[in-house]
Regions:
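Alpha-helix N-cap/helix-start positions at coil->helix boundaries
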Residues: 4-5, 41-42, 80-82, 120-121, ...
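Alpha-solenoid HEAT/ARM repeat scaffold
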Residues: 8, 12, 45, 65, ...
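Hydrophobic residues within the alpha-helices of tandem HEAT/HEAT-like
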Residues: 13-20, 50-57, 90-97, 114-115, ...
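Eukaryotic acidic, Ser/Thr-rich intrinsically disordered low-complexity regions
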Residues: 464, 468-491
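Eukaryotic tandem repeat interaction scaffolds
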Residues: 357-358, 367-433
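Eukaryotic alpha-helical solenoid repeat scaffolds
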Residues: 6-9, 19-24, 42-45, 84, ...
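HEAT/HEAT-like alpha-solenoid repeats
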Residues: 1, 23-36, 61-75, 101-115, ...
Length: 491
């Protein structure tokens, strides 16, 4: 079969079937051998995907020896790079099932040969398997062999003439480092890591920085800050957007692992640079992950929060929305007084933003703000302003956003909701008589959801008459429909 997708699915299914079989060891070994000795490369490629499942299934030494030998033969197929590519893709999985010293004698040489293949598209697949091969050696209590057989492959891949191979190694570098362990990583692989961070290809630098935070766990915060962080900081000046975006993600993952001292020394300057970055995507990545810095927010408030407040007026609506989403978090960490002095006006103005998603972002945090600031404070400082926005609004979508926000607030749990529910109810009842049908049926649905949280007297005296009137006399069919639906649900 020449269609790759069909072959791949057939191999996947065959592996599942082999794993479920109780017997048939001879037939399985025979099938793999027949495919691997076929005339067409397609059969050989399929065989490569079956070796792992077949080797696990058979138990006779002769059959296993035959499979290892056949795997080696396919790895030396000089006529067909596609076959060697298939072997390279599967060498890590195969290494995971070959036992003891046979792994060293029969599979590791295959891995090393493929990692130095003339074809770069073979090498890149082989070096991606370095982590799996190293883990197999460790699992077989052969961890000392990693220094001899895996680390040299990693070092050569980092210096490979093909950027695609270096990029493949960068993608798998963290996994390989964790497999070989902290000692080898600190002594042998940190120079490789810093080399990848300085690679002249942007794809390599971006791939390397993506998992950089995992190295703190391996080598410790102090070693990482001393040996690696200078090269990470250098990427702040990178002209490539993909690198800066990857670095902004890595920055937020590094902070919790490095601790407060290193965060204030190294991460804080990065944060300030990213929040001023010309790319909205970079700014957005930082804002969406501010919760990772929550623990140290009070310590860095003077340097970071003014920049966050500036972004509340950003021309990109996604950035403004991200600021609104972060407001409750900042309030939790900085306190009610800080919110009132610095964030309240910015937060309230979001309800009048021209973009609906920004208004929604603000409304989603209202319940959380109530939990932090208290219902009485919210009733005194926030609700009157929101009411005035509703009254002054000439744009019906703003009124809808306000109704949805207040509905969530009234439907919250605890005593706070009961304190605010009367205020909310009066505005929602006004919304039910708005001149715009969309606002009216939004209010109707809000009344339906609020009804279980209201006392019976309020439902009978205010909610039910309002819904009945709308169901009977509203000129809009949608409003009538939702009113009837709401009445049915509260009976």
């Amino acid at each position: 079969m020449e269609e790759t997708v069909v072959r791949d699915k057939a191999v996947e299914s065959a592996c599942v079937v082999i794993g479920l079989m109780q017997g048939g060891q001879h037939q399985v070994a025979e099938m793999v051998t027949r495919l691997s000795t076929g005339d067409w490369f397609t059969a050989k490629v399929s065989a490569c995907g079956l070796f792992t499942a077949a080797y696990k299934h058979v138990s006779e030494p002769d059959q296993r020896s035959l499979l290892r030998a056949q795997f080696d033969i396919l790895a030396k197929d000089t006529d067909t790079p596609m076959v060697r590519r298939a072997v390279a893709s599967n060498v890590g999985n195969f290494a995971g099932v070959v036992e003891g010293r046979l792994l060293l004698s029969d599979v590791i040489p295959v891995f090393e040969a493929l990692a130095s293949d003339d074809q770069d598209n073979v090498r890149l697949l082989a070096v991606e398997q370095a982590g799996k091969v190293a883990k197999s050696l460790v699992d077989q209590h052969l961890e000392n062999e990693c220094a001899t057989h895996v680390v040299p492959v990693i070092k050569h891949a980092v210096e490979d003439r093909s950027w695609r191979v270096r990029c493949a190694m960068a993608r798998g570098f963290a996994k390989a480092a964790h497999a070989v362990g902290p000692k080898l990583t600190t002594v042998e692989l940190l120079p490789c890591l810093t080399s990848l961070l300085q690679d002249h290809e942007t794809e390599v630098r971006a791939a390397t920085i993506k998992d950089i935070s995992s190295f703190v766990d391996l080598v410790g915060a102090a070693t990482f800050a001393r040996e690696v962080m200078p090269y990470v900081l250098a990427l702040l000046q990178d002209v490539n957007l993909n690198v800066r975006v990857a670095l902004s993600d890595a920055c937020m993952k590094l902070a919790p692992k490095l601790g407060q001292e290193h965060t204030m020394t190294h991460i804080l300057p990065m944060l300030q640079a990213f929040l001023r970055d010309e790319s909205a995507e970079v700014r957005l990545h930082i804002l969406l992950q501010l919760d990772g810095l929550a623990e140290w927010m009070p310590a860095m408030a003077e340097q970071v929060l003014p920049l966050v407040l500036e972004l509340g007026q950003d021309i990109i609506w996604r950035v403004r929305r991200a600021v609104m989403v972060s407001v409750p978090l900042l309030t939790e960490r900085m306190g009610v007084s800080y919110f009132e002095e610095n964030l309240l006006e910015l937060y309230l103005q979001a309800y009048r933003d021209s973009v609906n998603e920004v208004r929604v972002g603000a409304s989603e945090g209202l319940q959380r703000l109530c939990n932090v600031c208290g219902a009485d404070w919210l009733q005194e400082k926030v609700l009157p302003r929101i009411h005035s926005f509703y009254d002054e609004s000439t744009f019906y979508l703003i009124r809808i956003a306000i109704l949805n926000a207040l509905k969530k607030l009234a439907n919250g749990e605890g005593s706070a909701a009961s304190v605010l529910v009367e205020d909310v109810l009066q505005l929602v009842l006004r919304g039910a008589h708005d001149s715009i049908p969309n606002v009216r049926f939004t209010a109707v649905r809000a009344l339906q959801e609020m009804a279980p949280h209201l006392d019976a007297g309020a439902v009978d005296s205010q909610v039910r008459p309002c819904l009945t009137e709308l169901m009977q006399s509203d000129p809009d069919d949608d409003v009538k429909f939702f009113s009837a639906q709401a009445l049915e649900s509260i009976r």
